[in-house]
């Protein structure tokens, strides 16, 4: 990063503030500063005053959440207000056609594209159930409606020494409303081109003795957005050639105006054409290529870009003193939500079908291979229902004047049911094509009826229905022939978290510079993850375990064997804050200096032990105008249960892998046997983070606040797959010296009877593959998760805020916050030829942490307030990036910088508050990056595809 730009940013802010300070100020009576209350912020368990916080925490208030102009989705609010939330792991409603970032309608947040811990009221939440069927492992922040949030604390620093696993990039802590008095209801409606959203809420709270209870009801709806609704993603050609009317792998297609060969040729027992060439000669088919077929088909009307979503939620929190002695207090919270989402993909296609001779619609006198069947009016729909429940109950009290204690239990659960509709039931497809029955159900050669299974089960009764014409387009199909062919796969998954935590906090003693703070804590939690498809979605036979037998019957569906695993984690931490210099001493250069230290030890029943320390300082050299702070921390990321114990996927690996692994060797596409999935020997990934920064509040410019924090994080041993091509290349190059030599065998999978590995000498694997086409079919390769990857991040988080109150012209507030990436590099494997990929300033799909990472990303607001009127203009700015393609090294394409402006006006009548606004006033669409984001031509997560959005909100307080 050009550090001169950081200097320019600070200098410009100072100059602007100094100029503003020259304006006349409203007179205010001098007042003695009140004693600041003690608070506990995310990242520390020791209370401190707000001006003495040693960790970089950014707080978003409820007012800021509302002023963002975004609906109730926490991800979208955070991504807009805090630019550090960027990278493709910040996945949400824009995941509508991306199964690689499968969140089942949920929303994931990650600071600086790094693993980030999500808390509610300082405690953990169960991960999404989709993780049990090879989806993303994340906490769904969509279950936390904005209307229920009091504020959000975002710690941009490693914090495993306090919280344990996952806090590598930082922590996001959602603090729920807990002391609301009265009743408030509100609604929001928004509309844009081909898109709309609305939400409504009610929040009520009341004192209960010396305590209080608060509850919020919320409902929100967002419309789907189709690819065909936006010019940058429509028309969208070249995505698939698996279309109805194609045969021979899309080398031939039905001629224009012909919906089926039966319209022009005798079929079945009456067929006369001896070959496909004859059908080409008589004009039934015309030669083409897969590329030409794909180039003529616009897929955009068939796919959603943003999913449809309906979310209902209830949240509540309470704080009830139950005994004056020792200030014993009962506290807790509850969240219940149901999220229903829908997304649409292109219709499923069954490729490579061989139509038997004498089948009723076969136009040849022989079997007809290579036929593609698809029915375009039947899209592949996903209906996800996620029900989330979380309950916390605890007690807190005083041991003495200097010591307090707190203990709580948490139960959290995420239940997913996914229904994938319009999948093809494989056993019935062959029966439907073969026909062979008359209308009375009697076997007849070439009969136009089929006997198929009902209930999508081989044990279901047979039913007679019209035979299927697999050659036909939708217009040529016989009514009734699709019955019992298209069905729905049902997937269920559950994630559970049960935890207990306790801590004591107090003053260990007093040094000349002040009190020594100490916190001691312990936790025990149990995590459980389970998932299963219906019987037709299994990978293996439920009785014999054989691959592909009595299983994998949903064409286009999700395949997974039943899975269930759990683990227990116990941990303890200690944190201490030691003041070494006091402002009362008035020592030059050391007006105030505090050291903080923490360490946590955790034991995983499956992944062993982790011990992580943290050291930090807070230093005020002269006075409160300048505060310097820094931290050194170790963190860790435990492997998720699915990566360790999830079902393995044994399959035929596509033929493209071998020629890609050995380019220029003339090897044809050759499929081989592959197995990928879990690895029970995974260990936690580890990281080292270093942060240093400052807070500047210059006395010569009142109400100016500048912050800058530099972060350097080195994450090692991240869990990722090896890649079949990497395994083959490594063994061929290094022979038995390859770290993956044990992952390959012939005859059977490594470790099984009949398996052997004759490739100990470099080069012998390539020689073997060149020896004959059948040799690849005898290869058995295991690609499982490994602790291989490394990531190094270097970035700045900067901010500036300035306010000026005038005597007659109201109050002006100018604020900006930004994320500036110096470097973000990723190494997938420690192998020859593998180098670090640079993500910063690029858009790429390479590796695990792909996506768009602009070097400069800022969000700036200017607010004018006069009495009860508030006007705001906001700008989101992202610097230009380079589209480097799917592998990170393609010839680059420039992606233009992005800037969008928002306007908002609000008026508060006391009991009634109304606001109107326009997001993205100039209707700026996402800049094109077609190589990396081939599904939509642009990154629709980093850059919203909604365009101009008009909205209005109303809140009534009763």
What is the predicted role of each segment?
Residues 1-83, 205, 391:
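N-terminal Sec signal peptide and the immediately downstream disordered periplasmic leader
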Residues 27, 78-125:
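Extracytoplasmic beta-strand/coil segments of soluble accessory domains associated
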Residues 75-77, 107, 140-142, 166-187, ...:
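N-terminal periplasmic accessory domains that precede
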Residues 649-651, 810-908, 922-923:
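C-terminal beta-barrel architecture of Gram-negative outer-membrane proteins
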Residues 705, 714-716, 820-825, 874-884, ...:
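C-terminal beta-signal and adjacent terminal beta-strands/loops
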Residues 153, 180-205, 297-307:
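Short strand-turn segments of transmembrane beta-barrel domains in outer membranes
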